[in-house]
């Protein structure tokens, strides 16, 4: 957890420095490039990592090498898909289909897509030793590699931004991070080296496990990444850049804690199901409790301090990011159901994850456009924040079906929100009083 805290601190520091070196428009462009790249990645997600982690043959070199080969092909396909999108955008702009101030009409977007997503080819060569470490819950070296790679990439990005004041500095930093991470994984992690190999039996096993992962990823990515897709057509690059800063602050904690529960809960659930399946409910509720409390308390805390925090950290160009942070903090109330997803995958029920994401997708595309047309951009922000409430009835249904549900747990954990809000409000009041006293 402390290591992921270090990664969180690095992201915050880089955000603070880069917003002083680049204009808001740069962050809007990169936000959309990242969104398209993530969509392409998740649309080709056949659950390679999950299949290896949960397989009874997860240490078999034939399975690992087959997974590595599939991963390389997938990385190339992601990049080619993004190149096709770039060509389509360039052509649409040339013939006059994309005009005005919308982000899609930017002349920089196509080349940024081509070069900005090249790192997906690099990460395709990532060692499957990472999967073995996940399976054995041996995370120390993996986390150190991630922190070191991120640090080197951030330093590279800042140096290039300082010299050029260009959005390309962000692209270069991401590429350096990917190269460092892949090389270090092959060199420093324990395990046999990978080689190109294709075992038809294991390939079928991965595809069979991953068909529901793929369906789930399709729905998940269209919902979770849909905010920038929609906003990109509604607002200017500068407004989307400010939104991206606020969203980044709201998601830093979610992603850091999300990484912890992905790395910890999946192997833990698989282990208990292999050795003591009767303890699954006990382990599930015990693992959910700390994550629920962290997410819900953080939601209340960020809601209280959002505008004050952004005003403290960023220059006036990004002031509206404080309102974005305050609104999007509400999304943390629903992030806790990621633990449920890990449990369903361990129970060999990836279809449950697919139905969860179907509910998320339907909720998103019914609420967000309607809220935008009724209440403007602010209404869209609120809909983006709370649309995930649509997954709750589905999660409760599957929890009951698998014998994991507890009304008491669901109700009592919500009491953490006012605690977080009170702490945040007290912090803002104390800081304001102190600042006035100093003046």
List the predicted regions and their residue ranges.
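Transmembrane alpha-helical segments of multi-pass transport proteins
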Residues: 88, 111, 359-363, 374-375, ...
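Interfacial/gating helices of multi-pass transporter permease domains
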Residues: 9, 14-41, 61, 110-111, ...
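Signature of the first transmembrane helix
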Residues: 1-47, 79, 83-94, 115, ...
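Short runs within selected transmembrane alpha-helices of multi-pass transporters and secretion channels
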Residues: 7-11, 15, 33-37, 41-51, ...
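Helix-loop junctions and terminal segments of transmembrane helices
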Residues: 44-65, 134-135, 246, 250-288, ...
């Amino acid at each position: 957890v402390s290591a992921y805290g270090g990664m969180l601190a690095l992201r915050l520091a880089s955000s603070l420095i880069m917003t002083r070196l680049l204009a808001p428009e740069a962050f809007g462009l990169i936000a959309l490039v990242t969104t398209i790249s993530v969509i392409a990645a998740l649309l080709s997600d056949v659950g390679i990592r999950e299949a290896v982690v949960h397989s009874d043959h997860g240490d078999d070199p034939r399975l690992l090498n087959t997974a590595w080969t599939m991963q390389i092909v997938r990385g190339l396909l992601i990049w080619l898909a993004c190149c096709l999108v770039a060509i389509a955008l360039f052509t649409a702009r040339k013939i006059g289909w994309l005009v005005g101030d919308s982000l899609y009409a930017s002349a920089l977007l196509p080349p940024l897509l081509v070069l900005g997503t090249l790192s997906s080819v690099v990460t395709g060569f990532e060692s499957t030793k990472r999967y073995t470490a996940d399976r054995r819950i041996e995370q120390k070296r993996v986390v150190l590699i991630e922190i070191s790679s991120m640090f080197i990439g951030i330093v590279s990005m800042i140096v290039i931004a300082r010299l050029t004041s260009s959005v390309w500095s962000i692209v270069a930093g991401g590429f350096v991070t990917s190269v460092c991470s892949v090389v270090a994984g092959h060199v420093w992690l324990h395990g046999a080296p990978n080689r190109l190999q294709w075992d038809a039996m294991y390939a079928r096993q991965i595809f069979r496990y991953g068909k529901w992962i793929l369906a789930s990823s399709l729905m998940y990515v269209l919902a979770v990444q849909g905010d920038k897709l929609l906003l990109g057509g509604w607002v200017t690059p500068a407004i989307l850049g400010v939104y991206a800063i606020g969203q980044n602050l709201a998601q830093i904690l979610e992603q850091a804690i999300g990484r912890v529960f992905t790395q910890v809960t999946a192997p833990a659930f698989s282990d208990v199901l292999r050795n003591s399946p009767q303890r699954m409910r006990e382990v599930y509720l015990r693992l959910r409790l700390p994550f629920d409390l962290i997410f819900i308390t953080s939601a209340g805390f960020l809601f209280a301090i959002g505008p004050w925090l952004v005003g403290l950290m960023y220059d006036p160009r990004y002031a509206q990011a404080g309102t974005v942070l305050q609104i999007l903090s509400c999304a943390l109330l629903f992030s806790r159901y990621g633990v449920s997803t890990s449990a369903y995958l361990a129970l060999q029920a990836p279809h449950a994850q697919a139905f969860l994401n179907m509910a998320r997708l339907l909720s998103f595309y019914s609420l967000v456009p309607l809220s935008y047309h009724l209440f403007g951009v602010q209404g869209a922000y609120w809909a983006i924040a709370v649309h995930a409430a649509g997954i709750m009835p589905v999660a409760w249904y599957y929890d009951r079906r698998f014998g994991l549900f507890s009304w008491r747990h669901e109700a009592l954990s919500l009491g953490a929100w006012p605690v977080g809000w009170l702490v945040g409000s007290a912090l803002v009041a104390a800081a304001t009083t102190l600042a006035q006293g100093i003046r």
